[in-house]
Amino acid sequence: MNFFEGTVLGLVQGLTEFLPVSSSAHLRIAAALAGWEDPGAAFTAVTQIGTETAVLIYFRRDIARIVAAWARSLTRREMRKDPDARTGWLVILGTLPIGLLGVTLQDAIEGPFRDLRLIATTLIVLGLILGGADWYASKGRPQGRHSPLRPRKVLEDLSVRDGLLYGLAQSAALIPGVSRSGATISGGLLLGYTREAAARYSFLLAMPAVLASGVFELRSIGGKDADVAWGPTILATFVAFVTGYAAIAWFLRYISTRSFAPFVLYRVGLGLLLFSLLVGGALSPDAGAPPG
């Protein structure tokens, strides 16, 4: 990988990480279309350190409040009823499924899961699920905690059951094409949360798992047998941070007044286009895969 490829892939990562369209799928597809070698799961994980740093900065006040309340709850039992402390505990709970599955399925994540046929399928299927969840969330049910008519839930309503279900939804994102935010936002909408609450919790929930995965995969970058060098990876991570911060701000403003319909149409369209390229022979399912 050279610096130009690193810049392009960092831009793709930053622009798509927080949108429900799957950044890992876009990195895989972009490299295949450009005729570049698949950047691999390790490169994806490391560049996500940049986008998660954007989350840390964007939500710094929320995160500081949650961490402080959680820390106090370790020694003060009464603090465990505090909404921020409970959110901290539930983020930990929700991280367990993807952590366990990520270790168990590591070989599949770095191999078979990156097949472009599987990615095309998950783009379409999860797009339809997101569309169904968004329709369910907006079918005449008011948004807001204080509405007298079946109000949708906000983060203060988060329960142990919901936290675990959020975590299970996040685990699906181990397959490129699913989208971490797409899976968890869909899960949140189906559980009855507002669009804004589902998105904000999705971003918070991703942080421990994504940062841990990125740090773990640092060992795969820049070594003698590594496919990706340090220079392009660092550049890609920085570009992902800058564009990711802008994407968070835009996305949260967008969903406060609009539906996920454009993302649903985009996912389905991209999946169908990818299938047509595969069937027509313009791309092979393992395009860009390293030999061996």
Curated annotation (Swiss-Prot):
| Pfam families (UniProt xref) | BacA
EC number(s) for this protein?
Answer: 3.6.1.27
Entry membrane topology: Multi-pass membrane protein
Q: Using the UniProt record, give the first listed, main subcellular location.
A: membrane
A GO BP entry is: response to antibiotic
Q: List the disulfide bonds.
A: none
* Functional note: Catalyzes the dephosphorylation of undecaprenyl diphosphate (UPP). Confers resistance to bacitracin.
- PANTHER family according to UniProt: UNDECAPRENYL-DIPHOSPHATASE (PTHR30622:SF4)
Could you identify this protein by its name?
A: Undecaprenyl-diphosphatase 2
Q: Which organism is it from?
A: Frankia casuarinae (strain DSM 45818 / CECT 9043 / HFP020203 / CcI3)
